[in-house]
């Protein structure tokens, strides 16, 4: 099992007004360089067909996932099936974070808190 969580950022096509105050590249680079994560990556839209295929290829039953995206309830609804298809319990292995309508600094803080809680 991976000792460090993996951070996945879904940017909702880059057009979601909820992310207008977020500097995506500052966030992702801060997470990958300064936080205790296995790695950090960006996907343009996890809740569509190619996002579903990506998750099924990407997910492994050996670690925790922190997903920065929209409302956690929506993440659960849209992504839970992909996790279950590969035998991973979404409720136990995913920390869904709503990073919409946050400044870059606020989003960094929220991700850092999740990383610390995952230890």
Protein language model features and the residues they cover:
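Iron-sulfur-associated redox domains of electron-transfer enzymes in respiratory
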Residues: 1-119
């Amino acid at each position: 099992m991976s000792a460090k969580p993996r951070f996945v950022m879904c940017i909702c096509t880059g057009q979601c007004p909820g992310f207008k105050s977020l500097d995506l590249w500052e966030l992702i680079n801060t997470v990958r360089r300064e936080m205790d994560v296995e790695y950090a990556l960006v996907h343009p839209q996890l809740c569509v067909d190619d996002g579903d295929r990506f998750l099924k290829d990407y997910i492994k039953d050996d670690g925790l996932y922190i997903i920065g995206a929209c409302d956690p309830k929506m993440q659960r609804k849209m992504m839970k099936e992909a996790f279950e298809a590969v035998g991973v319990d979404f409720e136990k292995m995913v920390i869904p974070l709503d990073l919409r309508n946050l400044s870059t600094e606020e989003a960094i803080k929220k991700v850092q808190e999740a990383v610390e809680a995952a230890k």
